[in-house]
Design a protein with these regions (language model features):
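ATP-dependent NMP and nucleoside kinases share a basic, alpha-helical "lid"
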Residues: 26, 88-145
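Extreme N-terminal starter segment of soluble prokaryotic enzymes
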Residues: 1-6, 128
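P-loop (Walker A) phosphate-binding loop of NTP-binding proteins
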Residues: 11
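ATP-dependent small-molecule kinase phosphotransfer cores
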Residues: 32-99
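Hydrophobic positions on the alpha1 helix immediately C-terminal to the Walker A/P-loop
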Residues: 19
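Conserved lysine of the Walker
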Residues: 16
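Hydrophobic anchor at the beta1->P-loop junction of P-loop NTPases
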Residues: 6-8, 104
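Phosphate-binding beta-loop-alpha motif at adenosine-nucleotide cofactor sites
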Residues: 103-107, 154-167
């Protein structure tokens, strides 16, 4: 049975995870290992959903998003090696590839988009890299973290705009 592999990209807060769930299939994230690591550090696992709020007991201004970004990028991608999360994601996806729809809800870097294409070729399945947008949730040029700069347009195979009603569902 052949199926599809989808990667979603777009600005933070646009609704990528919500859109992924609406597609059905298996939703996975490149950030899953990072989130699992943070569960040990955060005061409570619920802080993973409160990404923009300062975390009590940490230096002023430290948020879950800041911790996800620095652990994932500065430590994982830059200090260890660029494909650390791609390799982990492949291990998570392998049981499903070619058997079910698989959706990655957090493409943030070109190597992640490239991995989606490579895995689709390897498993002889179709793939899409879908850019999700929503009015009022554009990429913020003042956000200096590289993970928020978006991926080059040549990776994107489809553009989808969601509205606030779709986001809330």
């Amino acid at each position: 049975m052949r199926t599809l592999l989808i990667g979603l990209c777009g600005p933070k807060g646009v609704g990528k995870s919500t859109y992924a769930r609406s597609l059905g299939g298996v939703t996975l994230s490149f950030a899953t290992p990072i989130k699992e690591m943070l569960k040990v550090v955060l005061p409570h696992p619920a802080w993973l959903d409160r990404k923009e709020e300062p975390i009590p007991g940490f230096p002023e201004g430290i948020t879950t998003r800041n911790m996800l970004q620095t652990l994932g990028t500065e430590w994982g991608r830059e200090s260890i090696y660029p494909n650390i999360w791609v390799d982990a994601a492949k291990r998570m996806a392998e049981p499903y590839l070619g058997k079910r729809l698989v959706v990655f809800d957090d493409i943030r870097f070109p190597n992640e988009a490239w991995a989606i294409k490579r895995w689709a070729d390897l498993y002889k399945i179709g793939y899409k890299i879908i850019h999700i947008s929503r009015e009022g949730h554009e990429i913020d040029p003042s956000d200096s973290h590289i993970s928020e700069h978006g991926i080059p347009e040549h990776f994107i195979t489809e553009w989808v705009t969601v509205d606030d009603k779709q986001q809330a569902e």
